[in-house]
């Protein structure tokens, strides 16, 4: 498994993807992505960083089936409405957008898209909402992503939504690797929560 991840991370890097985009594509942290890429370079073989503590989440069996995506989006929608009425669904690019699109249909809500910091060349900035989708000003929103790894993207999305005049009601995700209950006073609900034992 590790060698396949190293090869895939290197392949994506060679295609020009940023560290953040590779992390998003493989559902791993940016630290893990950097470590994997370093494994393929002979220059860094002598001074490798300590192996990060992370899990790779592969949900391709869900993502490759529109009916499975529908079922998962329905479950995420069900968790969202437990918190209240939603005006718009904000999908975190890239992998949160398919869920958000289906959820917006289920919830009869508008669709917005958030581009996280990790997809930008200048990672000292903050994420941004796409202008090609719904304006979320004065709307109650649910924020959707596939996997929480560190929680930084979710926190950034919440802050950007608030800065743009929205009321983030809840965050829903497929998998939470961090074990978060909330971020910036917004509850986080996950279908699967990974907890480390020991």
Swiss-Prot record:
The gene is gfcR. Contains an N-terminal DNA-binding winged helix-turn-helix domain and a C-terminal regulatory domain (or effector binding domain) resembling phosphoribosyltransferase (PRT) domain. GO terms for molecular function: DNA binding; orotate phosphoribosyltransferase activity. HAMAP family: GfcR. InterPro entries: GfcR-like, PRibTrfase_dom, PRTase-like. It holds the Pfam family Pribosyltran. SUPFAM superfamilies: PRTase-like. Keywords: DNA-binding, Transcription, Transcription regulation. This is Transcriptional regulator GfcR. Belongs to the purine/pyrimidine phosphoribosyltransferase family. GfcR subfamily. PROSITE patterns: PUR_PYR_PR_TRANSFER (PS00103). It comes from Methanosphaera stadtmanae (strain ATCC 43021 / DSM 3091 / JCM 11832 / MCB-3). GO terms for biological process: pyrimidine nucleobase biosynthetic process; regulation of gene expression; UMP biosynthetic process. Disulfide bonds: none annotated. It comes from the Archaea.
């Amino acid at each position: 498994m590790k060698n396949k991840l190293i090869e895939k991370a290197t392949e994506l890097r060679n295609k020009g993807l940023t560290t953040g985009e590779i992390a998003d594509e493989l559902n791993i942290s940016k630290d893990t992505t950097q470590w994997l890429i370093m494994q393929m370079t002979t220059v860094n073989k002598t001074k490798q960083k300590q192996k990060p503590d992370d899990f790779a989440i592969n949900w391709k069996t869900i993502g490759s089936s529109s009916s499975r995506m529908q079922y998962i989006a329905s479950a995420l929608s069900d968790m969202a409405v437990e918190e209240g009425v939603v005006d718009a669904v904000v999908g975190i690019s890239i992998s949160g957008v398919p869920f958000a699109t289906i959820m917006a249909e289920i919830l009869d809500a508008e669709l917005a898209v958030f581009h996280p910091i990790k997809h930008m060349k200048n990672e000292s900035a903050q994420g941004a909402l796409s202008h090609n989708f719904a304006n979320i000003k004065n709307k109650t929103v649910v924020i959707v992503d596939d996997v929480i790894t560190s929680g930084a993207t979710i926190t950034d999305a919440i802050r950007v939504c608030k800065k743009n005049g929205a009321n983030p009601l809840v965050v829903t995700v497929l998998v939470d690797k961090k074990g978060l209950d909330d971020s910036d006073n917004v509850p986080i609900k996950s279908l699967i929560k990974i907890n480390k034992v020991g």
